[in-house]
């Protein structure tokens, strides 16, 4: 079975909302994964597939405007109830992007582009919505050799290598400023769970996720002391001026 057989990202709603609920238990994870992106988050920021906005909470105080985009209106309502100043747009990213602003200083995509068969076309849309000098800030699953039933269940078309992100950036007009692995320990856990046919976050019980949240500073330290292939790649791509 391949991800081509799965319902696409925009319509796998029940699984998506359930995963968002699980991720609410990991505030330290969001702080950690967004930390490398914070220097590039300024001005007007558009976050794609923002969900309930847990990641936005890590940078909202340092930018002038946030536009949260998601296909699920209920998740956006939850986001706006906590952050009334955030503008929300209910948009299917697989369709047209006419409603999205075209003057973003940064666009954030955390675990998004792997859900689109034509990731090049997707990133070209991102390019068109950024100001010259603006940044596409991306997190994607790393290591194609780890591709498994979990990826299929999660609606992933692929996992990424550094070279693939470099090629994708070049083919869409971006300059790759930063590409690096994150979460070395997470990659080891993924290998043990890879035969399970469900979203990765749903393979953990709530108590386990709370424990992981407590351990995030240790995981971050391990990444710094023993860098290596991780569960994810963080990328900072710049639209040339």
Which sequence ranges carry the predicted segments?
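Conserved N-terminal segment of class I S-adenosyl-L-methionine
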Residues: 1-110, 120-123, 202, 210, ...
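Short, glycine-/aromatic-enriched active-site segment of Class I SAM-dependent methyltransferases
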Residues: 20, 136-158, 162-168
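Conserved S-adenosyl-L-methionine
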Residues: 174-184
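Core SAM-dependent methyltransferase catalytic element
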Residues: 191-198, 228-241
